[in-house]
């Protein structure tokens, strides 16, 4: 039987990320085209709405990831070095990663799994849901902070920095970045987490190759996505009120728009005024969002084989293994540093 001690949550925040969000909101709404920052959508309530949305029957990325993990987790676990620090960059979907953790335990790999998340309460829920008493070889902990906080922690923490590292990027996380920023982000991960032990350290990520507009848009308009999108406006109001402002947004004034961009090969999610120009509340009362003007808040890039090859190459990485299943557009890739 495993340890009865509850897993620890380590606060690795170098600053409170919430404090920067109002400035990011203002900058995005003053830009052209207008945007909203990703952090605005990941309040505790926002994450809960997203989890409900991702469990909808039409949301194929999650279902395909789980199918592949159930079938291939043993082989994935074999590719992770014994003694590794496994950091899950976005831990909301325990129902996915549990298959890999169970395979690591069955292989008697002595690893420590760190769930990283922006939400302390979501981390608490994640850790409470793990049947830790069923694990002897796999240990559990959590990191409260951003991606950047997690990478800095890996690079600077004594003992941790000298162990092999495996970074998990499930949930098509890398698809949320523009193609150039995705390569920069992967390169940043490599420079912080892979270079100390390049032969044993790796990134394990998922990418989606589906460019069928009907399948993609159906997935991203599935049940739960509208509450997820509108929750960001409520969270924004809370943050601006803490700074002495008023309700900047009225969620009733907006609707959610889902589109496929044929040119860029990506899904685009936006919030749009319902029926009139919208003047925002103080302190953004000088900003007007025009009727039908799109305020984009999310993209999901899809990768064909050439785009995937370019992504990994630009990041200075090579895919050493991949896992998928027949009929699935999603695949898992294990990336390592290119040899010098």
Curated annotation (Swiss-Prot):
User: What enzyme category does the UniProt record give?
Assistant: transferase
**Top-rank taxon:** Eukaryota
Q: Which UniProt keywords apply?
A: Alkaloid metabolism, Methyltransferase, S-adenosyl-L-methionine, Transferase
Which pathway is it part of? Alkaloid biosynthesis; ergot alkaloid biosynthesis
Could you state a single Gene Ontology molecular function term?
Answer: methyltransferase activity
Recorded catalytic reaction(s): these are:
4-(3-methylbut-2-enyl)-L-tryptophan + S-adenosyl-L-methionine = 4-(3-methylbut-2-enyl)-L-abrine + S-adenosyl-L-homocysteine + H(+)
Give GO terms for biological process: indole alkaloid biosynthetic process; methylation
Q: Give one Pfam hit by family name.
A: Methyltransf_33
E.C. no: 2.1.1.261
Function, please?
Answer: 4-dimethylallyltryptophan N-methyltransferase; part of the gene cluster that mediates the biosynthesis of fungal ergot alkaloid. DmaW catalyzes the first step of ergot alkaloid biosynthesis by condensing dimethylallyl diphosphate (DMAP) and tryptophan to form 4-dimethylallyl-L-tryptophan. The second step is catalyzed by the methyltransferase easF that methylates 4-dimethylallyl-L-tryptophan in the presence of S-adenosyl-L-methionine, resulting in the formation of 4-dimethylallyl-L-abrine.
Quaternary structure annotation from Swiss-Prot or TrEMBL: Homodimer.
Q: What family does the Swiss-Prot or TrEMBL record give for this protein? A: Belongs to the methyltransferase superfamily.
Q: What is this protein called?
A: 4-dimethylallyltryptophan N-methyltransferase easF
What organism is listed for this UniProt entry?
Answer: Arthroderma benhamiae (strain ATCC MYA-4681 / CBS 112371)
Gene that this sequence comes from: easF
């Amino acid at each position: 039987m495993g340890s009865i001690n509850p897993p620890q949550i380590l606060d690795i925040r170098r600053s409170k990320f919430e404090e920067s969000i109002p400035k990011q909101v203002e900058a995005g709404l003053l830009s052209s085209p207008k945007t909203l920052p990703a952090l605005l959508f990941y309040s505790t309530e926002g994450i809960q709405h997203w989890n409900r949305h991702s469990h909808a029957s039409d949301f194929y990325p999650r279902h395909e990831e789980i199918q592949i993990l159930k079938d291939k987790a043993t082989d994935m676990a074999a590719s992770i070095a014994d003694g590794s620090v496994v950091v899950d960059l976005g831990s909301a979907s325990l129902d996915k990663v549990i298959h890999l953790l169970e395979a690591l335990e069955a292989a008697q790999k002595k690893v420590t799994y760190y769930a990283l998340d922006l939400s302390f309460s979501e981390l608490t829920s994640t850790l409470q849901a793990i049947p830790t008493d069923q694990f002897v070889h796999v240990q559990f902990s959590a990191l409260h902070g951003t991606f950047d906080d997690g990478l800095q922690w890996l690079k600077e923490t004594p003992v941790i920095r000298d162990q092999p590292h495996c970074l998990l990027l499930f949930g098509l996380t890398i698809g949320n970045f523009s193609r150039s920023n995705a390569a920069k982000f992967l390169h940043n991960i490599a420079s912080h987490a892979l270079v100390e032990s390049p032969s044993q350290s790796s990134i394990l990520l998922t990418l989606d190759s589906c460019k069928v507009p009907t399948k993609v848009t159906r997935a991203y308009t599935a049940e739960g996505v509208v509450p997820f999108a509108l929750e960001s406006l409520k969270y924004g109001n809370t943050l601006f009120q803490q700074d002495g402002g008023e309700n900047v947004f009225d969620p009733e004034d907006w609707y959610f728009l889902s589109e496929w961009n044929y040119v860029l090969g990506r899904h685009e999610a936006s919030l749009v005024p319902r029926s009139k120009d919208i003047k925002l509340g103080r302190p953004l009362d000088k900003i007007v969002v025009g009727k039908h003007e799109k305020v984009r808040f999310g993209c999901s890039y899809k990768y064909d084989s050439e785009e995937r090859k370019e992504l990994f190459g630009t990041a200075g990485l090579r895919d050493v293994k991949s896992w998928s299943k027949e009929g699935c557009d999603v695949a898992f890739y294990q990336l390592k540093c290119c040899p010098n």
